[in-house]
Amino acid sequence: MTTEQQIQENLLQAWMEMSVFIRGNRILTGLSFNEVMICGMLYRQPSDTPLTATELGERTNLLKSQINHILTGMERRNLIERTRSTADKRVVYVQLSEEGRRTYAQEHAGVMAILAAVHEEFGSEKTKELTAMLKKATSIVNNYMDPNATSKEK
C-alpha cells in the first residue's frame, strides 16, 4: 500500500469511527437527523420569508416524498405549522411552532456542548482550521458526486 493509500485509509477509518459514534450514541434525542436539519433551516429563516416544502427539499437534497413524510410527522407532533399563501393558494409555507422552537433549541444546546468540548481541546485556531477543512471536504465530495453542479447549488 502506498503512503497516499494509507492516508486515505486512515481518513476513511476516522470518518467511519465518527459516524459510528454519532449513530450509536444518539446525540440527537428528540429529533431525527433530518428533522434537526429542517428545524435548523426553519429556525434561522426570517419570519417574513417562510420556506416551502419544495425549498426545504432542495436545501436538504431529500426527495419530495421524504420531505412530505418528515413534515407530516413533525406536524403531528406540533413541531411545525403549515400555512397557505394568501397570494397563491397552491403554495404552502412551513414554519416552526413554539414547541418546534423549544425542541430544536434543546437539541442544538446538546450538540453545541459537544462542539464546545472540541473547541476547548483544539483551541480557536485549530477549530477554525478544522471548520474550514470540513467545509472544503464537503465541497470536494459534492463536486465529486455531481461534477456538473456549481458550488451555489450545493
Please give the residue ranges for each predicted region:
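N-terminal leader segment of winged-helix/HTH proteins
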Residues: 1-29, 33, 40, 77
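Basic amphipathic alpha-helical segments that dock to polyanions
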Residues: 39, 56, 71-77
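Charged, amphipathic alpha-helical coiled-coil/dimerization segments
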Residues: 72-129
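N-terminal helix-turn-helix DNA-binding core of bacterial DNA-binding proteins
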Residues: 20-66
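Alpha-helical macromolecular-interaction surfaces
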Residues: 13, 69-70, 132
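N-terminal positioning helix adjacent to the helix-turn-helix/winged-helix DNA-binding module
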Residues: 7, 34-38, 52, 99, ...
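Short glycine/proline-centered loop/turn elements that form peptide/ligand docking sites
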Residues: 31-32, 66-69, 73-76, 148-151
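Terminal interaction helix/tail motif
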Residues: 9, 109-154
